[in-house]
Amino acid sequence: MENMLVAIDNEYPGRNYKVEIFTEELTALCPFSGNPDYYKIRIVYVPDKKVVELKSLKYYFVGFRNERTTHEALLNKIFEDLKNVISPKYLKIELFVNIRGGIEVTVSREEGETLEKVD
């Protein structure tokens, strides 16, 4: 599915700025029950030479709709794919799992230079 993501040139590659993306339109299937899992996802990155084209990101998310996957695997798949496509200076992804059975779960991963200068 990585090939669904489109990278476009960063028009300001010499500048440190952050891009923050948030959506509630991410679903996948529980690998055990087959029931849908609903997610909110927050992506924060400091671009280098490329940025992600947002329509391609939306279609990429839709591609998970019928995939059986754990929360942890989903987070790491999205993280690796985005990292491979745009090679950001910094990347953080938080995956908020819709509450099920009274349990609230958030999984996250981050790599790269800190955002201290751009916060």
What are these regions (language model features)?
Residues 1-119:
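N-terminal intrinsically disordered, cationic/polar leader segments
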